Amino acid sequence: MYYICGVTNHSQNKVLMKRNLFWLFLFTCSLSWADNVPVSKAEQLARNFFGIHETTRAGDSMQLEYIWDGEDVQTRVTTSSPAFHVFNRTPEGGFIIIAGDDVASPVLAYSDTGEFEVENMPSNLQGWMQYYREQINWAREQHITPSESVMKLWEQLQRGALADDAEKEVLLKTALWNQNAPYNNLCPKISGSSTPTGCVATALAIVMKYNRWPDQGSGGTCTYTPSIYGSQLSVTYNVPYQWDKMLNVYEIGKYVGTQADAVATLMYHCGVLSQMEYAPNGSGAFTLIAARGMIEYMKYDKSMTLQSREWYTEAEWNSLLKKELDAGRLIIYGGSNNKEEGHQFVLDGYKQNDYHVNWGWGGTANGYYSLSALDPDSQGVGGNTGGGFTVGQDAVIGVKKSEEGSGYCDNLAFMSGFTESGEMFSGLTTTETTFIPQVRFTVKAGFYINYGIRNF
């Protein structure tokens, strides 16, 4: 995906909510039907949840107030099968949203402080609630059944038990870097205006700082001409990187010139290998080109891959990401809103199914998020106009030092479509029905995309 990051600071309406929003429609080949969740059951599940989570645990005095059944706030349309149930907790404070159908994960959102105000709901929260209402109702109409992982969550909550891995937590320490000075000191200026490093370059640099790799570049030269800047940029990757001089945090007046030069050099080199399109209002680059550049110029392993979330089930995707973090490997992650305003950042930890995000904004908004609710309350350099970064998510997997004998992992996708002459292709097909070893047969394909790191 192409990620362009502007310099505008966007403040979002703050919602006191821990991001715990799971994918709402998970497919399975089970023959069982999904069931509606009545308010009585939802209340018991809410009590169980507050009782088993350390940060929300309450005493015997806890009371739950049923404040919203998920109906449309504007039209007040009532329904016998609400999409979700909202409870405020008293007197301790906090609230919880329980799904109205077990096709979705049971706890859509919760907070251990504050309260849920239906009448004064911020517009961004209204949008979230409308989206989840539509998706749950759509799943009902399509007779979608819950996945095994979702059914397990319901069973555990009904028992008042924590998930098997609920206590496991991984958090890797990463630099709190940003896109402005001193990070962009070497980035080109356009008409006298500085350009930000770009979120792609910043994410790469944070990962390389964590790895303290490479010791120096591969020796190759990367040359390209950005269309907006208009002049050729070129870097020969043969200089050592001064990891000991790079600070984890750069505060005004608390660093010297050599420390600024060290991080600015790394940032600029990451930008050039990404073929960054520098611009004063936002610098952008393609993740695939950036990953390719890490291998070619920064001595990272050829087995690195770019994976799309839509290719996996929720359980598979979580397993893939957690395996990386368990191995001590950071994940270069990206997503956009429905306006295709994207951002690249770093996943550096997880707790249950929430992931710790380093947004590349100097520490602003860093914290745990559900991947289905990557919508920080405040944003820094590279923020979008709202709607979070939940669309088109992808991840660079296998970011590690080059290993001898490793090879590229090619990923070729065959697509359906019509040619200009009207011929229909349905991916990779053959008319052969019997396959005999060492006997040739014909396959047919019309459209394909190379999702791999290398060109071929």
Regions found by a protein language model. Give the residues of each.
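Stable alpha-helical elements in mature extracytoplasmic
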Residues: A42, T195, V200-V207, A290-M294, ...
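Surface-exposed patches in mature extracellular/periplasmic domains of secreted proteins
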Residues: A58-S61, W213-Y224, S303-E310
